[in-house]
UniProtKB/Swiss-Prot annotation:
Biased composition (Polar residues): 76-89
Main localization of the protein described in the UniProt heading: cytoplasm
Family label: Belongs to the P33MONOX family.
Taxonomic path: Eukaryota, Metazoa, Chordata, Craniata, Vertebrata
Encoding gene, per UniProt annotation: P33monox
Keywords assigned by UniProt, alphabetized: Cytoplasm, NADP, Oxidoreductase, Phosphoprotein
Organism for this UniProt entry: Mus musculus (Mouse)
GO molecular function, one term: oxidoreductase activity
Tissue specificity: Expressed in neuronal pyramidal cells of the hippocampus and in the neurons of the cortex.
Enzyme class per UniProt: oxidoreductase
Recorded GO CC terms: cytoplasm
Name the record gives this protein: Putative monooxygenase p33MONOX
Pfam families, per the entry: P33MONOX
Length: 303
């Protein structure tokens, strides 16, 4: 052939066929893509043994024997009848339905397992006092698993009722007493009620500033910070956010300072400055008596 001649370059197209001059079945890799785009002929010629190419995938005999038989049966049925029979449709749709069913079963099993593990943890932690209303995603079967949210809601309701009951005896104390500067320590007993109650009420504003005229406004203002609920557990511990010791209000601090000034004005006065008298006494300080021979001690050694 012409490609064996040494003077002709190996990649140059020779003969009338051009790119097809290579042996059939051999793919030539180095050719101009522009010519190939313009040329309607295929870029690589089809192989010579077109009929012997195995178009069906090779399925090993050990595995998938059942699948191979079903495929062969479906092929024979489709070759006999032009319209595919409903048996083949059902055989095609069966694995899809099975997979979907297994997915649903697995998801329900997983949710049930997680719910049971949460339930077990709540039993150990002692948080199993009330139920839980499920969100829209949960099924009705899962509503029987109990939660803490409803317990907190019930505790808030109970604490609100106890706070209402404790407001009535406190209103009797809110009338200004004969001694307006009485210390609030006598009335702080109402802050910690005896017995086991579900909530510690907040410090009552009526007991904090009894002398002020706007008791009603301050009560409305402080009612926003309601009583904090206590979560009671089976272990006997009461869980509550620690807010520190009850701080006195600024009005209370100012009133306490005013009582101190009224009781003993001498103690509240600032101390007198006795600095000028002291300076007058210590005026005759000794002046430095430096003689020329003492300067040798004060000068650095390098001079």
């Amino acid at each position: 052939m012409a490609s064996r001649q040494p003077e002709v370059p190996a990649l140059a197209p020779s003969g009338p066929l051009g790119k097809m001059s290579l042996p059939i079945g051999m793919c030539r890799r180095a050719f101009s893509y522009d010519d190939a785009l313009e040329d309607p002929a295929p870029m690589t010629p089809p192989p010579s043994d077109m009929g012997s190419i195995p178009w069906k995938p090779v399925i090993p005999e050990r595995k998938y024997q059942h699948l191979d038989k079903t495929e062969e049966g479906a092929a024979s049925v489709s070759s006999l009848a032009v319209t595919p029979s409903p048996a083949t449709d059902s055989s095609d749709k069966a694995p899809v339905v099975k997979a979907k069913a297994t997915h649903v079963i697995m998801s329900s099993l997983i949710t049930k397992q997680t719910q049971e593990s949460i339930q077990r943890f709540e039993q150990q932690a002692g948080l199993r006092d009330a139920g839980y209303t499920p969100h829209k995603g949960l099924t009705t079967e899962e509503t029987k698993y109990l939660r803490v949210a409803e317990a907190l809601h019930k505790l808030k309701l109970q604490s609100g009722e106890t706070a209402k009951e404790e407001k009535h005896p406190a209103s009797a104390q809110s009338t200004p007493s004969s001694t307006p500067h009485a210390s609030p320590k006598q009335k702080s007993r109402g802050w910690f009620p005896s017995g086991s109650s579900t909530a510690l009420p907040a410090p009552n504003p009526h007991t904090m500033d009894p002398g002020s005229g706007n008791d009603r406004n301050s009560a409305d203002k402080w009612s926003l910070f309601g009583p904090r609920p206590l979560q009671k557990s089976d272990s006997g511990f009461a869980i509550q956010a620690y807010k520190g010791a009850p701080r006195p209000s600024p009005m209370e601090v100012m009133r306490a300072q005013a009582t101190r000034v009224g009781e003993d004005p001498a103690t509240f006065k600032p101390p007198k400055m006795d600095v000028p008298m002291v300076e007058g006494k210590k005026q005759p300080l000794r002046t430095h008596n430096l003689k020329p021979r003492d300067l040798n001690v004060l000068t650095p050694t390098g001079f």
